[in-house]
Every structure is written in C-alpha cells, then in structure tokens.
Regions:
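Extended intrinsically disordered, low-complexity coil regions enriched in Ser, Thr, Gly, Ala
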Residues: 65-80, 89-91, 272-287
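DNA target-recognition patches
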Residues: 125-156
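A short glycine-rich beta-alpha junction/loop motif
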Residues: 1-2, 28-52, 122-125, 131, ...
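Non-catalytic DNA-recognition/assembly elements of restriction-modification systems
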Residues: 98-121
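A short beta-sheet element
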Residues: 1-19, 34, 138-139, 150, ...
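Extracellular/lumenal glycan-associated surfaces
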Residues: 52-64, 68-71, 107, 259-271, ...
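Charged, alpha-helix-forming regions
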Residues: 83, 89-100, 108
Length: 295
C-alpha cells in the first residue's frame, strides 16, 4: 500500500482527494513505481478558503450518495426477505408473512394447468436483425426484469410466421452459464406495435385470471426459483426443458390476496428504482462537478 500525505497542513484533505481523483491516472502493466510518477503531477490549488468550500461540497455529495446507497441496499434486502416470507415454503399452505384479513389456505397449481407456451423467434439469420417496423424482447430484458422493460427491445422485420407477444404473457430464459440463473422470468405489462420474443426464451400465456404483478414476483420467489433451478441440466452451460417447466407447481392465493401482494411488491420495486436513480443522478452530478471545478 502506498500513501500520499499533505505537506501543508492548511490544505483541505477532501479537496486534495477529489483533485487527485480528477487526474484519471491508471498505472500500466503492474507498474511498481507509479507512486513517484503520480507524485510529480501538478494540480491547481486555490486559496485555503476556496479549498474549504469545494471540499465541503464534495464531502456533502459523498455523504448523500452513501445515504441513498444504504437505503437502496436496505430495500433490496427487505425485498429479498419478503420474497422468502410472503410465499408458502415447500409443503406448506400459508406464508410466514401475510396481510390482515386473509386466512384461506393457498392452492398449488401446475404451470401447465394455468397456461400454454409458445416459442420465440425462429428461422432467422443475423442479417434479419437491426432493422424493421417490429420489435423483439431481448434476452437481457427477460433475465434482468421481473416486469419486462418496454424500452429494452430491438428492431426486426414484421413476420406473420412468428409468435407475437401479448400483454400478460410471461417469458422464461431457457439457457444460462450457471444453474442459479436459468429459467429467469419476466411478465409483459405493456407494449407498442408488433413485438416478438427473442429465440433464447420461450413464452407462456396464462389462460386463467392471475394478478400480473403477483405473477411477476411469485415466479421470482425463493420457493419457485428453487424448483426451477432443480430442473437445470448441463455442465458448461445449463438448459431447462419447457415441458419440465410446465410440471412445476406454483402457489396461488385468492385473486384479492394476489392483488394485495403484487401491489405491495411492485411499490417496493418502484422505491428501489427511485433510490437507484437518485444514486446515479448524484454520481453524474459529482462527475460533472469534478470536470468543471478542477483544471
């Protein structure tokens, strides 16, 4: 570990730190004596009073970023805990955490009883992508989002032979590098125009009334994910059978309780997104100020 210290005790440590951050110097090829090179850089030093002002500003920004990051992590941990506790564990008929007024036992229904499947895009080559009036849901959209992001789509030509997705459909990834990441699900709540599904996923269309927010979070709950992961097959890459997936039993309370759970978890997700955006906005602000306040 190498340390740089201030030779003038009146200089502000926070100002100095941010000024050094703005140098953007990266040691090359395990460079051993980079500290001596780093020490020779010249940085502009304003008056002591201005250093204090600038240092205090960045200290406040850093504190605010840290605060929102902690809130963000706290809410992510809360969501993870609720996804474990708001759905019945294997072999049980009621969850550990439940809204008041609901006492009925939950049902266990196979996915194959509740809906039907369809395939993603097929019969295409690389030249067919990147242009056209239709769009397709990307693999990363399905993998990353319990509720599909309507903006994470790519262009493709309209093709009547392909299966067009509908609002309320569920998408599942069929392959992954690890068993823990296979069979990730995403529910479509909105779309514009003609939209298809990428070829590395399959679609699922419920034929019974299910609250879509509940469906999105239930399919990513710990109890359901364990069942999906158990079906993963492979060595260097793991795959999951569409037919096997349809044999999985999932927990279903009354539609009223579904709506309550789905709405609550969706609101929590929105709060997580809000704090994530605040953190990103503050980080962009800090980066912009670093570029503008140091020469």
């Amino acid at each position: 570990m190498k340390l740089l210290t201030l030779t003038n005790e009146r200089d502000n440590i926070y100002f100095a730190f941010e000024a050094l951050q703005n140098l953007n110097y990266v040691p090359q090829n395990h460079e051993r004596h980079w500290i001596s090179i780093f020490s020779d850089f010249d940085i502009s030093i304003p008056s002591y009073g201005e250093q204090q002002k600038i240092g205090a500003l960045f200290k406040e920004i850093d504190s605010t970023i840290t605060l929102h990051q902690r809130k963000l992590e706290s809410m992510k941990l809360l969501k993870k805990s609720l996804l474990q506790k708001m759905f019945p564990k294997s072999g049980e008929t009621v969850p550990e955490v439940r809204f008041p007024g609901f006492t009925d036992a939950w049902e266990q229904r196979k996915l194959g009883e509740l809906g039907t499947t369809y395939t993603g895009i097929s019969g295409k080559t690389s030249s067919d992508f990147g242009h056209g009036d239709a769009r397709f849901i990307t693999y990363m959209n399905v993998y990353s989002n319990a509720i599909a992001n309507p903006l994470m789509v790519e262009p493709i030509e309209i093709d009547q032979k392909q299966n067009e997705v509908k609002v309320g459909d569920v998408f599942f990834t069929t392959s992954s590098e690890t068993p823990d990441e296979v069979g990730m699900s995403s529910v479509l709540l909105e779309k514009q125009g003609t939209v298809y599904l990428n070829s590395f996923c399959f679609g699922y269309r419920p034929k019974e009334k299910i609250d879509l927010h509940y469906l999105a979070f239930m399919l990513r709950s710990e109890v359901v994910r364990k069942k999906i992961i158990f079906l993963a097959q492979g060595i260097s890459r793991y795959n999951i059978s569409k037919n096997k997936m349809m044999e999985i039993s999932v927990p279903l309370p009354t539609i009223e309780e579904q709506s309550k759970i789905g709405g609550f978890l969706n609101n929590l997700d929105n709060l997580i997104t809000l704090h994530q955006r605040k953190v990103e906005a503050l980080q962009k602000l800090k980066k912009s100020l670093l570029q503008q306040m140091f020469v």
